[in-house]
Structure formats: structure tokens, C-alpha cells
Design a protein with these regions (language model features):
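Feature responds to low-complexity, polar/acidic, surface-exposed segments characteristic
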Residues: 2-40, 52-102, 109-130, 136-177
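Conserved dinucleotide-binding and phosphotransfer motif residues
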Residues: 49
Length: 177
């Protein structure tokens, strides 16, 4: 039952995160948001529980911006309550900045994300909907083995995400989130 509650909580939170990744949002306290956005409540909840905190010290959220792979690792580490402090000073990839390294390392250890090859994570790259969806679905227990993907992980991810309604109300394409 505990795992079911965790999965449902993760699914609901992830749906809110994915909606914001793609469509933007607004929340009280941010300088660059307006209350007319459909994602206001989701942003306020994620802000209140410490999962998302905005993009700078000036009080901006950047609702029309996109997330990088590094930033998504931070979101997932907070969402899953991973012990990222354990990974401070650990950097398994040559292209991950120090601020993101413990979050990326925790997500890699949990099996939520992986590098792009040759010792690189691609953390400064804009995360795609398929990549974000895969991280969420791995956290939910999907795609634990390589053979789960078939010949194309992106197609498998989008197909399964659609099947479980992960992308409901998310306006996206396979290129960017």
C-alpha cells in the first residue's frame, strides 16, 4: 500500500511538473507570472513543498522557459526525496556543474536517469518530453530493464506515457519540452 501511495503521489506531482515544463505557469510570489495561467495552483504546491523554487534570487519563475536535464534531475531528486546530500562532491560526468552534480548522481544511482555516452550527461541540453517522461516513468517503476524499450526508447516512452495518461493536458512534441 505504501508503494501505491508513493506511486500515486509521484504520478500526480509529475503530471504537474510535466505540464509546467511544457506549458509554463504562474504562482503567487513570482515576479514574472500572472494568475490567469492554468498551472498556478500546481506551481504554488510545488513551490510550497520545496520541489521547485524559481530560476533566480529576483523572484522569477520563467514560466515560458524550458528545463535542462540538470534542472530536471534537481526536480526529480526533490520529488523522490532522494538523499542527494550523500552525493555532494561526487560527479560521475565530466559536463555536470558542481551545483547539479549531487542531484544527477542521486538520480543515476536510483536508476531515474543516465548519461548520453562518453562520460557525458548532457545536463545543459533542454530536456525533451520523452526524456522527462522517461525519468518520471522510471521513478514509477516502468522501464527497469533495457529489453523493456524494444528498438526505440523514445517511441516506447511516448507510447507508455500516453497509455497511462502521463501527458494528458500537456501540449508538446517529441523535440522539446
Amino acid at each position: 500500500m505504501r508503494n501505491l501511495k508513493r506511486a500515486l503521489s509521484l504520478l500526480l506531482s509529475s503530471t504537474m511538473v510535466l505540464g509546467m515544463v511544457v506549458m509554463g505557469g504562474s504562482a503567487a510570489g513570482y515576479q514574472d507570472v500572472d494568475a490567469s495561467n492554468d498551472n498556478q495552483e500546481a506551481i504554488e504546491v510545488l513551490q510550497a513543498v520545496g520541489i521547485m523554487s524559481g530560476v533566480d534570487d529576483a523572484g522569477n519563475f520563467n514560466p515560458d522557459g524550458s528545463l535542462t536535464r540538470n534542472e530536471m534531475a534537481v526536480v526529480m531528486a526533490h520529488l523522490l526525496n532522494l538523499d542527494y546530500d550523500y552525493y555532494r562532491g561526487v560527479n560521475t560526468f565530466t559536463d555536470v556543474p558542481d551545483w547539479a552534480a549531487p542531484y544527477v548522481a542521486a538520480c543515476v544511482a536510483e536508476g531515474v536517469t543516465a548519461g548520453i555516452g562518453n562520460g557525458l550527461y548532457g545536463g545543459d541540453q533542454q530536456i525533451t518530453a520523452a526524456q522527462a517522461g522517461l525519468m518520471v516513468m522510471k521513478a514509477l517503476g516502468y522501464f527497469q530493464n533495457q529489453e523493456d524499450f524494444g528498438s526505440d526508447w523514445q517511441v516506447a516512452t511516448i507510447r507508455q506515457a500516453s497509455y497511462i495518461n502521463l501527458f494528458d493536458k500537456v501540449n508538446s512534441n517529441a523535440e522539446s519540452a
